[in-house]
């Protein structure tokens, strides 16, 4: 891939600095460990009061380079140092697989610690976090830097201990969940995460882009009539194609007029779009999504009567993860397995909004340039392509395009068989378990031994990948094929052409295609890559158009029956265009998710800030008297000439809502007093009751009650926002923008949430009892 002018300029600038670092290798050669640690302490102290110069940076890099050479026997080369300098600028460094990103990370982490920042190193999974912590962590520890591993099974005290380290390794979800859990604690001392200074993200495209479609959620069980899912399943199984509309690439399906009429008759409601029919509409739409948009062995897999999500970008099953907002239950009903309770959201944040809270963020990956616009727009990060240390020696040939999947399958078997006969290892990449198993059947029929890797046997991943570079080995894998791990070639494989990679479908992102190709030709090894695709592949079917249908029919009519690939510039253009459109659609989904989450994000920050102040001060930020006065003023504003009968009902309602059994104002008093006098009497009575408590006791009670009510109301508010989000598109008519409607109604719901917990707090204040603390 060509680098743009800015890339070349940056790389040229940093190449000179990197060469100066290498020239400094004699500077620390004769120092023992204690002397090197003294250097570490010197730099740490210096930058507490002074800015870091370029000369300082060169010396610090040289110090880390010497330590790596001693401890793990690796001397960082110029391109790795260039990459580290790019990371230090808060950019994404695209470095080809096998070029040494792990060693590159050492330098930016070390220099950020010298600047006084606590560093979080984020990896794609716990295995990689543990591996990299062991390898690079020992170098940092040799220099006196504390290093820890953030794992999911740690208790609160262990978490607090690891967050005191200078460098902490872990997964994106674990850091994110720690943040959410910290904002659910009842005491300040129970928080574990201590500041978000600098984060370095490995496999940045996977974490910041691919995982961005799934928000982080902490939830519990939500009571619901689960039988509705089975009932709706009966309806949707009878749906005909002329009863609904579908845009699969946008992941959207809806009922047309015929479908609405059928559903209303089935449910026995006059209108699905009335308040009466909202529950039935929601459950019907969920089952339609499950049947028409979610595909078994592609989006999910059923193992031991359990529905498991398949990560679309890694091909891995995700045990413990569930589709939210009822979709998982809908799929369970579709597959006729046990429908489990839907979860209720207690706390949530998107990957985008979590990482944007860090003061500084950098990323490294083998494939990022194709997503540069998204990195720049969402994260304000440029992508810089780092040159390889050795020339890439892989042969990448144009796609072979076949008319049918059947012809493609025969051609793949032929391609694999002759490479197998000569002993060349071959990696066959598929986009789903379904196609993975189809190709496996073809290879079995041809008598070609092979190993299979997909979400159903992911536990053997390391073992399978370890064998993939052996002479004569054929490996069939979904796109989970070992990100973060090398396929090492047997010595005699080089002369056979290295590892051959055969892609059986173009993926929904060019980036994933490049990742598959990047399995071969690492560190100057020879290699080969080719995609063998057909006009019947899912990518093209998702973007059917009248013009494409006409072209497809015309091409198939003229197709030679010899099974050879067609070399048509028109077809190549259609494939490229379909992939770009799908990339654009997925980007729109992620932008859409972020736009909607930004509404909640603003609200979340306000609530979490108020919680933090409450925990910090250990008392209310405003007096309970002020809150009670505001609520009482709101409750007792009524017309002076109100009719007697209405006043009695009004009084009874307000008494029950505001004060319950201990309401301090009688009906007779209310009927004779001005609203302001009623309010004053309520506040005065509360003050007298409050003064009966020791100050420490009443302060603690008020804080606990307020916090408890705020948390309860926040959970209810999140649920209300989910319901609003689910239904907003169904209610968006004419020129009304669903996002604008969501922002407006979301703001109204937030105002109601704030009013509600203040109202219930005022109620609790009037129920205070010096003997029983808070009644009820």
Swiss-Prot record:
Amino acids binding ATP: 80, 98-102, 486
Signal peptide: none
Xref: SMART domains: SecA_DEAD, SecA_PP_bind
PANTHER family in the cross-refs: CHLOROPLAST PROTEIN-TRANSPORTING ATPASE, SECA INNER MEMBRANE COMPONENT OF SEC PROTEIN SECRETION SYSTEM
Organism of derivation: Listeria welshimeri serovar 6b (strain ATCC 35897 / DSM 20650 / CCUG 15529 / CIP 8149 / NCTC 11857 / SLCC 5334 / V8)
Biological-process GO terms, alphabetical: intracellular protein transmembrane transport; protein import; protein targeting; protein transport by the Sec complex
Family listed: Belongs to the SecA family.
Protein name: Protein translocase subunit SecA 2
Quaternary assembly: Monomer and homodimer. Part of the essential Sec protein translocation apparatus which comprises SecA, SecYEG and auxiliary proteins SecDF. Other proteins may also be involved.
EC number annotated for this UniProt entry: 7.4.2.8
Bilayer topology: Peripheral membrane protein
NCBIfam families recorded: PRK09200.1, SecA2_Lm
CDD domains hit by this protein: DEXDc_SecA (cd17928), SF2_C_secA (cd18803)
InterPro entries: Helicase_ATP-bd, Helicase_C-like, P-loop_NTPase, SecA, SecA_DEAD, SecA_motor_DEAD, SecA_preprotein_X-link_dom, SecA_SF2_C
Annotated localization: Cell membrane; Cytoplasm
Coiled coil location: none
Catalysed transformations (reactions): ATP + H2O + cellular proteinSide 1 = ADP + phosphate + cellular proteinSide 2
């Amino acid at each position: 891939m060509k680098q743009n002018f800015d890339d070349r300029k940056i790389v040229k600038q940093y190449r000179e600095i990197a060469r100066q670092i290498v020239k400094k290798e004699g500077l620390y050669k004769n120092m023992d460990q204690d002397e090197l640690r003294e250097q570490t302490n010197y730099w740490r102290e210096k930058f507490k009061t002074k800015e870091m110069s370029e000369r300082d940076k060169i010396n610090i890099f040289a110090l880390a380079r010497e330590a790596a050479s001693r401890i793990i026997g690796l001397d960082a080369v110029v391109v790795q140092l260039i990459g580290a300098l790019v990371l230090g600028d808060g950019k994404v460094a695209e470095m080809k697989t096998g070029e040494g990103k792990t060693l590159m990370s050492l330098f930016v982490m070390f220099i950020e610690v010298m600047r006084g920042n606590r560093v979080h190193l984020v990896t794609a999974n716990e295995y990689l976090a543990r591996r990299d912590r062991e390898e690079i962590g020992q170098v940092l520890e040799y220099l006196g830097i504390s290093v820890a591993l953030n794992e999911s099974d740690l208790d609160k005290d262990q978490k607090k201990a690891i967050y005191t380290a200078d460098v902490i390794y872990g997964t994106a979800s674990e850091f994110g969940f720690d943040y959410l859990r910290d904002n659910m604690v009842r005491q300040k001392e129970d928080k574990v995460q201590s500041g978000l200074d600098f984060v370095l993200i490995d496999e940045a495209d996977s974490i910041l882009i691919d995982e961005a479609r799934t928000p982080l959620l902490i939830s519990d069980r939500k009571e619901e009539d689960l039988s509705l899912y089975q009932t709706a399943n009966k309806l949707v199984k009878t749906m005909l194609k002329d009863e609904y509309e579908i845009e699969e690439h946008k992941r959207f399906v809806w009922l047309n007029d015929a479908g609405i009429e059928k559903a209303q008759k089935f449910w026995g409601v006059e209108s699905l779009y009335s308040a009466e029919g909202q529950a039935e509409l929601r459950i019907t739409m969920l089952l339609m999504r499950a049947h028409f948009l979610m595909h078994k062995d592609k989006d999910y897999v059923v193992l031991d009567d359990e529905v498991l999500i398949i990560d679309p970008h890694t091909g891995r099953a995700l045990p413990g993860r569930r589709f939210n907002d009822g979709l998982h239950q809908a799929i369970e009903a579709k597959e006729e397995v046990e429908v489990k309770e839907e979860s209720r959201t207690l706390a949530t944040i998107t990957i985008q909004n979590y990482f944007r809270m860090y003061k500084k963020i950098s990323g490294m990956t083998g494939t990022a340039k194709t997503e540069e616009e998204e990195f720049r727009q969402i994260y304000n990060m440029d992508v810089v392509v780092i040159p390889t240390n050795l020339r890439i020696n892989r042969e990448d040939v144009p796609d072979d395009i076949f008319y049918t999947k059947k012809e493609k399958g025969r051609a793949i078997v032929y391609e694999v068989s002759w490479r197998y006969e000569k002993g060349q290892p071959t990696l066959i990449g598929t986009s789903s378990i379904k196609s993975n198993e189809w190709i496996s059947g073809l290879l079995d029929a041809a008598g070609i031994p092979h190993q299979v890797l997909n979400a159903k046997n992911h536990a053997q991943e390391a073992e399978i990948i370890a064998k993939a570079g052996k002479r004569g080995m054929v490996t069939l894998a979904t796109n989970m094929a070992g990100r973060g791990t090398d396929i090492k070639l047997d010595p005699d494989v080089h002369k056979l052409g290295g590892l051959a990679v055969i892609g059986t479908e173009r993926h929904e992102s060019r980036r994933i295609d490049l990742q598959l190709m990047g399995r071969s030709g690492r560190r100057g090894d020879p290699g080969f890559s080719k995609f063998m695709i057909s006009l019947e592949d899912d990518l093209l079917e998702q973007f059917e158009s009248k013009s494409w249908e006409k072209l497809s029919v015309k091409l198939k009519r003229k197709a030679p029956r010899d099974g050879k690939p067609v070399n048509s510039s028109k077809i190549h253009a259609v494939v490229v265009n379909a992939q770009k459109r799908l990339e654009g659609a997925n980007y729109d989904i992620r932008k859409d998710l972020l736009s909607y989450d930004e509404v909640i994000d603003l609200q979340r920050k306000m609530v979490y800030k108020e919680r933090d102040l409450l925990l910090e001060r250990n008392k209310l930020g405003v007096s309970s008297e002020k809150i009670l006065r505001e609520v009482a003023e709101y409750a007792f504003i009524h017309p002076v000439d109100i009719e007697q009968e209405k006043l009695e009902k009004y009084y009874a309602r307000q008494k029950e809502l505001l004060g319950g059994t201990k309401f301090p104002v009688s009906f007779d008093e209310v009927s004779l007093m001005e609203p302001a006098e009623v309010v004053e009497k309520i506040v005065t009575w509360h003050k007298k009751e409050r003064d009966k408590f020791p100050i420490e006791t009443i302060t603690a009670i008020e804080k606990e009650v307020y916090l408890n009510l705020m948390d309860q109301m926040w959970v209810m508010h999140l649920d209300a926002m989910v319901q609003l989000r689910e239904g907003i598109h169904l209610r968006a008519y004419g020129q009304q923008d669903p996002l604008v409607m969501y922002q407006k109604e979301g703001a109204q719901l937030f105002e109601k949430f704030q009013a509600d917990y203040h109202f219930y707090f005022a109620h609790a204040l009037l129920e205070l009892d010096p003997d029983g603390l808070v009644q009820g």
